[in-house]
């Protein structure tokens, strides 16, 4: 009997559920997002995230911002890029004890050429690392940026 208990304990301790440090979700506007505010130049929507932690998406003047988790003020502080941009749809949630503490999201930045025109070859990609709001600390903010085109190991850098 003890052999079974030891084997089961070893199996559970080494299973992915105990060692998992990240997981992924998608922002799905058609199926898991609800628009909570509309205005002339944009929207704010709440989308399904990781196991009850919502994703708050905002767009204004062709610039996007995403916040994560339980936050008390949806539009308390705008954090985006000066250039037109769009957020990707895949979120990497960084987990500790199965609870998210950070989220990583790729943004696409519409950089211009020297004449001020948008050119696809100048498009930037930035991995944005944000905190995840909890009931105890209901705020989410950007804590890091990694230039995904300038760094070969951008994803590894964003996870540090």
Q: Can you describe what each PLM-predicted range is?
A:
Residues 68-123:
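Mature extracytoplasmic domains of secretory-pathway proteins
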Residues 141-160:
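C-terminal partner/receptor-binding element of secreted or periplasmic proteins
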Residues 122-147:
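Short acidic, glycine/tyrosine-flanked loop/strand segments centered on an H-E-D-like triad
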Residues 54-57, 91, 130:
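Generic hydrophobic, helix-prone segments enriched in Leu/Val/Ile
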Residues 2, 16-82:
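Charge-rich, low-complexity N-terminal segments
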């Amino acid at each position: 009997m003890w052999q079974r208990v030891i084997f089961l304990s070893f199996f559970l301790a080494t299973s992915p559920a105990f060692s998992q440090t990240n997981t992924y979700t998608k922002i799905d506007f058609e199926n898991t997002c609800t628009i909570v505010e509309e205005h002339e130049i944009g929207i704010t929507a709440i989308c399904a995230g990781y196991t009850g932690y919502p994703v708050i998406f905002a767009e204004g003047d062709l610039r996007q911002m995403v916040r994560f988790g339980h936050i008390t003020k949806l539009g308390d502080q705008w954090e985006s890029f000066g250039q037109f941009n769009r957020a990707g749809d895949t979120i990497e949630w960084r987990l500790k004890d199965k609870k998210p503490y950070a989220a990583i999201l790729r943004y696409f930045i519409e950089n211009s050429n020297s004449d001020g025109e948008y050119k696809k070859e100048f498009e930037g990609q930035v991995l944005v690392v944000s905190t995840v709001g909890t009931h105890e600390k209901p705020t989410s903010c950007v804590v890091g940026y990694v230039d995904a085109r300038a760094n070969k190991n951008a994803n590894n850098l964003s996870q540090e």
